[in-house]
């Protein structure tokens, strides 16, 4: 969905770049990227399971305590995705995909927006579980889709909200789009 939703912003690219980007990167490019982003103030340590807290604290101090954050700030993305003047369509074909799928996306707020909670409630009502409105309508009543879902990209900058339907055998993309838009 990101590729279709973002023309300018890096959200529209894979996290590590395309194969072409990776193949074109020099050793100096990789070292510079590592120095810029792989640093203590841009990392998160996650520990789960049954462990001894004192032992964990000792290991964290031993292995991570000596690491020093650089004095320079982390470069942040400042690109702004312009509003789309017209709806966009993207068709993707892939091998071994037994059923067609359709997706419709809308701009979504940034994570800092007070509207995020309302979007999360909307998402739960529309598509969470077999009692959700989309599931009831598209899967049970219309028998149009085998599965429905959503992708909510709530990020640091404005993201996207997408509704997805994997269509039932014999159903057309046009039928799927019409039902998602209803």
Segments from the language model and where they lie:
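Non-catalytic beta-strand/loop surface segments
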Residues: 1-40, 66-113, 124-174
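Non-catalytic, conformational "gating/processing" segments within enzyme and secreted inhibitor domains
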Residues: 27-63
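Short amphipathic alpha-helices in soluble, non-transmembrane regions
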Residues: 58-64, 176-182
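Zinc-dependent metallopeptidase catalytic helix centered on the HExxH motif
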Residues: 115-117
């Amino acid at each position: 969905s990101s590729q279709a939703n973002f023309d300018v912003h890096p959200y529209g690219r894979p996290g590590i770049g395309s194969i072409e980007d990776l193949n074109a990167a020099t050793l100096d490019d990789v070292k510079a990227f590592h120095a810029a982003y792989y640093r203590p103030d841009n990392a998160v340590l996650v520990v789960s399971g049954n462990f001894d807290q004192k032992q964990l604290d000792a290991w964290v101090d031993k292995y991570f305590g000596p690491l020093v954050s650089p004095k320079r700030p982390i470069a942040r993305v400042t690109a702004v995705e312009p509003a789309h003047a017209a709806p966009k369509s993207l068709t993707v074909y892939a091998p071994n995909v037994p059923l067609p799928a359709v997706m419709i996306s809308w701009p979504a707020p940034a994570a800092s927006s007070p509207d995020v909670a309302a979007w999360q409630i909307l998402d739960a009502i529309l598509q969470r579980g077999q009692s959700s409105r989309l599931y009831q309508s598209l899967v049970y009543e219309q028998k149009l889709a085998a599965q429905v879902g959503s992708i909510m990209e709530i990020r640091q900058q404005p993201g996207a909200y997408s509704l997805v339907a994997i269509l039932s055998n014999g159903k057309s993309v046009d039928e799927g789009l019409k039902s998602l838009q209803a």
